């Protein structure tokens, strides 16, 4: 069965603590490359609310309940429009070359457990926000970290 094409509208969720340490996760599909990033993911349906996409992706990628009592999910009201990386172009319908990314923040307790989905990510690290920005492969992700 063929997978449906991805919707070119996604979220970027900067997971951080009150002390401004940022959770970065390493992509498992990046081969030998060091693709560190925050939580990202596309909408599952055109009418899926962005906050739902953000909470769902955080749960799928890290095991963190973004709507839990000790967490605060915030829509930063920032949109980035960028060219889809060539290595991931085939996931989108023919002719789709750009993605609209919506930025969220998620403040979590420092001791929140992280449970990665090994099909998507191979490692995680908590870093002070400036160091996290330096490690991100995506410029929009780095900029979002620096907004903390």
Give the residues covered by each predicted segment.
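Conserved N-terminal beta-strand and adjoining loop/helix that marks the start
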Residues: 1-23, 46
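Active-site segment of metal-dependent pyrophosphate-handling enzymes
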Residues: 64-112
